[in-house]
Amino acid sequence: MPATAMNHFTILTDDVDATIAFYGDLLGLAPGPRPPFTFPGAWLYAQNRPILHVVGGRPRAELRTGVIDHMAFTSNGLAATLAKLEARGLPYDCRRLPDAGQWQVFFHDPNGARVEMDFAADETR
């Protein structure tokens, strides 16, 4: 039984609203239907798929990063994304892949999770 696709990532947070706003503003993810769990949270959607689950109600001391280094999203609008990051005062690292030329932008969300956004090689800064 091979895996056929990545289904979702889950972010643990002590501030659900700030996390929803962050991913909505920078990645265009939108809250959508979520089962009636007994804990606070949200499911954030891209193209009608719940790709990011936000789980709240845990004090910061209980949050953990585990062994996952980062989550990556295929995106478009490199220049606009960099402008948003700069306007928010968020540090980022913008790199170009050798040979392929694809752009990678790394930054951290309000919970400390590392996010990568990937852009086509023909985009400009």
Describe the predicted segments one by one.
Residues A21-F22, K84, N111:
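Structural preference for long, well-ordered alpha-helical segments within the folded cores
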